[in-house]
Amino acid sequence: MIDITLENFETDLLAGSAQVPILLDIWAPWCGPCKALGPVLEKLETDYAGRFQLAKLNADEQQEIAGQLSQMFGVRSIPFCVIFVGGQPVDGFVGALPEAQIREFLDKHVPSEGAIESELETAQAEQLAADGQTASALDLLEDALARDPGNDEARYDLIKLLLAQGNPVAAASVFEPIASRATGLLAEPRVTAFGRYVNAAQSAPDLRPATVLTELIAANKRDFTARFDLAQQHFAVGLFTQAMDELLEIIMRDKAWSDELARKTYVAILEVMTKPIPKPSAKPAAAAAADQKGKLEIAGKHEVASADPVIDQYRRKLSMALF
C-alpha cells in the first residue's frame, strides 16, 4: 500500500498503474465509512496477490487531487475509490461496498491469474524464438493460449511460428477462434491482417511457380494477377519486403485494381510486421515529474514504441504511391 501526495502522484500512481492496476482509496480521518472500507481493501490487496496495488489519498491533506478526481467522476462524497490502469483513471465506486461487490468491480479491471501467467509465457516464448528454440517457444505459446484464450499477441506469435514452419493448416486452426473479428464494419485491423497472412499461406501452394510468374511480369508489367500471386507467395513465407515491392508496383499503376486488393494486402503486411506497443515504463513519467512539480496531470504520460526503420520506409513508400 502506498500513500499518494502531489509529489508522488505521477511517479507512484500514474506511472505505477502502467505496470499494475492501482486502486486509489480517497478517505479522511473523520469519515466513518472510510474506516470500515479500509481493512476490506487491504484484505483484498493481499488476496489478489499482486494483481492490483492499493493506494490511499487523504482528502483533507490532498484537496487538489481529490477535488479533480471527484469533479471528473461527478462525485461529492467519500469514501471514493478510483482504479487507474495504464496511467489513466478508468472507473470508480462510492461508499463502503460489501467485499463481494468490490471483487466484482476489481475483476472488471484486474487481470486474472491465468492472464498474468499467459503474458509472462508469451514474453518468454518470444525470447526463445529469437534464440532459435522454436519447439520450446511453440510449447509455451500453446500453454499461454490455453491459460488465456484472449491473449491475442500469443495467438499472433503462434501463427507466425507455425507459418514459418510451413504449417498453414495448424496456423488456420489457431486463427479460427478470432476469424469473426476480421470481417464486417467493426473489423479489427490486426486480426484482419493476420487473416490475410494465413490466407496467403493457404493459397500459395496452388499458385503458379514463382519462375513462371516472374516471366509473365517481365513480358507484361501490367499483369497484376501474376504480380499479386508472386506477392502472395512472398508474403506466405515471410518475405515481407519483397511482397510489398510487388504490391507497390500494382498500386503505382492502378490503385483501385481488384477493389484495392494490393493496398489492403500491403497494409496487412505492415501490420503483421509491427510489434505491439510495450507497456509504458515508470522511468519517463518519473523524469517528467521532476520537471513538473506542483502541476497535476490526471492522465499519465506514455512511451512511444521505438520506430522500425524498415516499416517506416515502406509506410512512406505507400504514402507516396497513394498521394
Question: Where on the chain are the PLM-derived regions?
Answer:
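Thioredoxin-like thiol-disulfide oxidoreductase module
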Residues: L6-L14, E42-P111
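A short beta-strand-turn-helix
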Residues: D3-I22, A218
